[in-house]
Amino acid sequence: MQKSVRYNEGHALYLAMLARKEGTKRGFLSKKAAEASRWHEKWFALYQNVLFYFEGEQSGRPAGMYLLEGCSCERTPAPPRTNAGPAGARDALDKQYYFTVLFGHDGQKPLELRCEEEQAGKEWMEAIHQASYADILIEREVLMQKYIHLVQIVETEKIATNQLRHQLEDQDTEIERLKSEIVALNKTKERMRPYHVHQEEEDPDIKKIKKVQSFMRGWLCRRKWKTIVQDYICSPHAESMRKRNQIVFTMVEAETEYVHQLYILVNGFLRPLRMAASSKKPPINHDDVSSIFLNSETIMFLHEIFHQGLKARLANWPTLVLADLFDILLPMLNIYQEFVRNHQYSLQVLANCKQNRDFDKLLKQYEANPACEGRMLETFLTYPMFQIPRYIITLHELLAHTPHEHVERKSLEFAKSKLEELSRVMHDEVSDTENIRKNLAIERMIVEGCDILLDTSQTFIRQGSLIQVPSVERGKLSKVRLGSLSLKKEGERQCFLFTKHFLICTRSSGGKLHLLKTGGVLSLIQCTLIEEPDGSDDDPKGSGHMFGHLDFKIVVEPPDAASFTVVLLAPSRQEKAAWMSDISQCVDNIRCNGLMTIVFEENSKVTVPHMIKSDARLHKDDTDICFSKTLNSCKVPQIRYASVERLLERLTDLRFLSIDFLNTFLHTYRIFTTATVVLAKLSDIYKRPFTSIPVRSLELFFATSQNNREHLVDGKSPRLCRKFSSPPPLAVSRTSSPVRARKLSLTSSLNSRIGALDLTNSSSSSSPTTTTHSPAASPPPHTAVLESAPADKAGDSADMSPCRSPTTPRHLRYRQPGGQVADSAHCSVSPASAFAIATAAAGHGSPPGFNNERTCDKEFIIRRTATNRVLNVLRHWVSKHAQDFELNNELKMNVLNLLEEVLRDPDLLPQERKATANILRALSQDDQDDIHLKLEDIIQMTDCPKAECFETLSAMELAEQITLLDHIVFRSIPYEEFLGQGWMKLDKNERTPYIMKTSQHFNEMSNLVASQIMNYADISSRANAIEKWVAVADICRCLHNYNGVLEITSALNRSAIYRLKKTWAKVSKQTKALMDKLQKTVSSEGRFKNLRETLKNCNPPAVPYLGMYLTDLAFIEEGTPNFTEEGLVNFSKMRMISHIIREIRQFQQTAYRIDQQPKVIQYLLDKALVIDEDSLYELSLKIEPRLPA
């Protein structure tokens, strides 16, 4: 018996599984049975050259398999059908597709298959045809033959190439041989030439003619070439390329400095603090280090790569291609974006960490490193915020000197657009963190430190020099005179005003600040401001006459110590008015917050009044306003972008008035609106307060607390026309009680039958213990105390913030002088009414007709508050920005008409009338002080017949008069000229005449110095003149006239003088060392970092270099637009501009006390002594000609 064929069944099953998953062709087919002519439907799967079939698609084991190697497949016609069965079934069978698989040898029965669709049948036949290993071998053999043929061709080409290379090398060798032969032949000819010359003597005239011809040809070629070069040098293209190259060189220098700053930040602060955080007793943890220095190290690595790329480009000069470098920088901007978003949080974390004394001590050690050059950590953290705007300015300048068809132009424009997007975010963050950095800088200047400045909610308002008048017992002023030199020297104080505190410091010779041991830090919540101190009994004329009405008094009533008084003198009436306005507004904000918290019952931990929190318009972004995360002095989010309407609405919001918003608005309103529009808004608020205030604001103004709802007296308003108004609120005094209950000391001239409430004007009181009243009020005023009566007396001993209510008051009691207590039920005053009266009429007596009904009248409250707001804004506007009214007579007349309309109100309170009269007096007075003296006035006063000469004038006289002239020119610049970059426009002389005069004066003084040096013919006289002018510059430095220092040093650095090596060799070493010191002080390196530090450490008066501030303003203007794409005002930018203008005006407002010397001034202003630049250089070449090359 023949045995059956054995095969590997397990492997066959594995192949069947692969066929089911990865088969070439799979699907149902009908297979004809071998026994009977019956068709059975099976599921077939073709894998390589093996055909499996299964009982169904889900069957795991195959029913059989066919080996297709060496077989063929062809289509067969449908078999004949019997007539049995329905006709439809026969038609269906005829339409099916039949094909047969034939095996290679005889005797093997073919495999007959069929499928329902013709397309599927063709695909099966094609797949079976290709399932042959023999066919694949044949195709492989054909490909191998082709490959071998190609390899042979390549080898042949290589051989041919080598042959050609050898031929070329042989030819090169032959060429070198022929060249050497030619050289040898030429040398042979040269040796043989003398014999031919001897034989044929040339005519001497011919020799001369040839020499002249050769000379003429050379001269003509050189002249032609010089003309070509000169024409190109003077061409616009060459000028543009020079400027472009200069921009690139400046950019490389700035990038080098920036990388060095980042290196100091990382290696001088970040890495040492990481090590300190890993110590046993860490002064700071790793999380805080990461929060402060987020991405700083990565930014340093990025810019080191960028800097190396710039230096590599310079190596290929004059070909400068920069666009690809910016293409490298742009993808890394997301690193900068993270740094920008973290910037404000970084400075807040740093301020909190500085409260740890160990960390503060360690940080001071790091900052004492000579590499830091006296700069603080927050300064280094801010440098990356200014770098992207600097790139934008550079790209602007590059594009201005790049032709439109230049290959780099599109790339540079794309880089600029991408950087501008990030720059807008950076400017917003820099604006938001300006206040934190300013506070930290002042805190670091104070030797003893000042913890209150580490509070990030403190907002810097103003600083300046004031004179503190010494006082004796009983609050009487010492008998001192304003002109006393000892008073100025010993009593000069550097004062800083913040939203919550007032700092009084003395400055040491090194520039550092020292807080006064007594009264150095004044909490404004404990202060009462007295604008016009009354004279004592011994001095009937009063201190106002003694000090020229420049003094004001701050009465401090600390809760745990005896009260004391600080008397300060301002340098001018305008300065006094500005200080008074800002201090009273800061006190006002604090008192308003405190009163609102008492009136509107809140949780003791909540400092923001409920009615402000519930107004979404004050903190929620909308289509016409966008807020930042930073809060202003009234605990309301600062405005980032807003429409003009929303800014005017914030200015006239009767619930609060932020002093920092008001100062920014008054500094920059000219950019986005006009003075006429602002005044019209104030006039509308006064005349039509109900139609000018948004409805939602009115609703929230009268909103009452949930737990203390009192009903207003039912009745109509007595009249709809304006009858009542109030002047700007001033400070109220706070007293402490033995039982530590919260009290507000208030004085009022109310009718004795009514227990109403009012606040006394502190400007009308002479001391904190005495109370005065308006002259119109004949009866003595009644003292009232508004007392919070808690249900639980145990809560009285809790430690409370000055601005918070200690507990929920159940009712208000009015304490009359006789000791009787009247319950508040006698006058049903709503919390909103009580607050409005207390704040709107702060410090003023009540009118005779003030009664219970008017107290509860909403219209009455709104009118009083609206009048208060109008007078408050006008007081700030007139006292701080008098130039607005001096230069715009129409605006001045409109304000006068509005104030006269207020004065015509028959029911105006005496104190309101006094406040209005003060504003009118400030507008109408003609101040003849020399603070308004102009350069033209001095020129007219110095018409002397004979001017002094340089030799007869001392260095001190020259320095003093230069300082006087520089400060007069500097302070004459109106602040509106700093807006809009007018000094860079084509019509700059019309838009910014005073800035252009300042620039012209700077150039004329510098030209005078250079001209006077060049006027001397002998070397010794020129050297002596240089030494004298350096001495003048050093005296200017002592006088804080850094503009004068730069005038002289720039003159000495002119090429006409700098090139005089023989003259400089005669100058002493001490003078040269002093010259280097002065140049370092006023150097432009690092955005004038040395000059900024010097100005920060000196007291006014001073004359800074104006170009430094103009650069800052141009930097801000170029970095971000004034308006967004939606047409909103970029108020963050306005805030940054306001900070710079505030610093400029700080130096403008403090005048020098230097007497004019007409002869010296006439010498300094004599234009006949000035030599122009070209003549100076020609004179310099005559004095010391160029050395032959």
Swiss-Prot record:
Coiled coil: 158-193
Protein location: Cytoplasm; Cell membrane; Endoplasmic reticulum membrane
Region listing for Responsible of the affinity for farnesylated versus geranylgeranylated Ras, in residue ranges: 1051-1080
The Ras-GEF domain, residue ranges: 954-1186
A single cellular component GO annotation: plasma membrane
Phenotype seen when the gene is deleted: Mice do not display overt phenotype.
GO biological processes: long-term synaptic potentiation; postsynaptic modulation of chemical synaptic transmission; response to endoplasmic reticulum stress; small GTPase-mediated signal transduction
Residue span of region Regulates proteasomal degradation: 743-751
A single GO molecular function term of this UniProt record: calmodulin binding
Domain notes from UniProt: The Ras-GEF domain and the N-terminal Ras-GEF domain form a Ras-binding site and mediate Ras activation.
Name under which the protein is recorded: Ras-specific guanine nucleotide-releasing factor 2
Species for this entry: Mus musculus (Mouse)
